[in-house]
Amino acid sequence: MRFLCLHGYAFSVEVLQQQMEPITAHLPSDWEYEFLEAGMEPTELMLPNLKQVPKPNYSWYNFPYPEDVEEAYERLAAYVESDGPFDGVWGFSQGGSMAALLLLMHQAEHPDTPYPFKMAIFTSAFLPHSFDNGVVSWDLTEKNTLEPTYLPGRIDVSHGKKLDWKKDLHTSIEYDMINAVKDELDFPVDLLLRWRPSDIPEKIPVPSVHVRGLKDHYSFVDESVYELFDPDMARKMTHRGGHNFPRYNEELVHFAELIIDTVVSLY
């Protein structure tokens, strides 16, 4: 098995390798793991404690500006094309979001061709941003409050003012972030919406493993990525930790069993 491994926000290949060592020690020794580093510098506007994070560190993108998300996606897709084939993709946090985006885009653009991966593993992953759901354009009012304007995309032609963009799952995260740093941004700011499981015509038919911590402090790390996939081909577990990999031995063993069972199901 050959896996493409994608790190999270403000991470690096080296850090992801270190965090994966406890789980890969429970997997077959002849499996290969190839790591791709993201291409953008993270910002304190997204992560206030960035100075405390070991350097070097990278992000796939910062705020979900359409051009930045597209650049990250195109870079990843080109790498898979040039350095593949890979048997599986393994994404942590934002890397998991990018892995899900790659599979969703394949489903949308090449539904009748084989997927680029036979299986996918997601650790502490969250929903990716979508190129087809339109954008929310945020601007500052005279009272220094954020005012959203919905610009419809191919999928969400019915949203308009029906949603509370400050509370909706797919914009509340970005709203909270830009509201916290609004004095340091140039407005208006156009941000992509996220995919929803209800957006896709059918669940992704790729065997998958989904792992998240019960103490994850990011509320947007939930069951949503799992719900993108065919439930008959998806396996999931939770562990006692937070936004990280399982650390207790019995949890690592269970995680490894899920991965190995998924690999066995491929043949």
Curated annotation (Swiss-Prot):
<dbReference type="GO" id="GO:0005737">
    <property type="term" value="C:cytoplasm"/>
</dbReference>
<dbReference type="GO" id="GO:0005634">
    <property type="term" value="C:nucleus"/>
</dbReference>
<dbReference type="InterPro" id="IPR029058">
    <property type="entry name" value="AB_hydrolase_fold"/>
</dbReference>
<dbReference type="InterPro" id="IPR050593">
    <property type="entry name" value="LovG"/>
</dbReference>
<dbReference type="GO" id="GO:0019748">
    <property type="term" value="P:secondary metabolic process"/>
</dbReference>
<comment type="similarity">
    <text>Belongs to the AB hydrolase 3 family.</text>
</comment>
<comment type="pathway">
    <text>Mycotoxin biosynthesis.</text>
</comment>
<protein>
    <recommendedName>
        <fullName>Hydrolase FUB4</fullName>
        <ecNumber>3.1.-.-</ecNumber>
    </recommendedName>
</protein>
<keyword id="KW-0378">Hydrolase</keyword>
<comment type="function">
    <text>Hydrolase; part of the gene cluster that mediates the biosynthesis of fusaric acid, a mycotoxin with low to moderate toxicity to animals and humans, but with high phytotoxic properties. L-aspartate is suggested as fusaric acid amino acid precursor that is activated and further processed to O-acetyl-L-homoserine by cluster enzymes aspartate kinase FUB3 and homoserine O-acetyltransferase FUB5, as well as enzymes of the primary metabolism.</text>
</comment>
<feature type="active site" description="Charge relay system">
    <location>
        <position position="243"/>
    </location>
</feature>
<dbReference type="Pfam" id="PF03959">
    <property type="entry name" value="FSH1"/>
</dbReference>
<dbReference type="GO" id="GO:0016787">
    <property type="term" value="F:hydrolase activity"/>
</dbReference>
<dbReference type="InterPro" id="IPR005645">
    <property type="entry name" value="FSH-like_dom"/>
</dbReference>
<feature type="active site" description="Charge relay system">
    <location>
        <position position="93"/>
    </location>
</feature>
<feature type="active site" description="Charge relay system">
    <location>
        <position position="183"/>
    </location>
</feature>
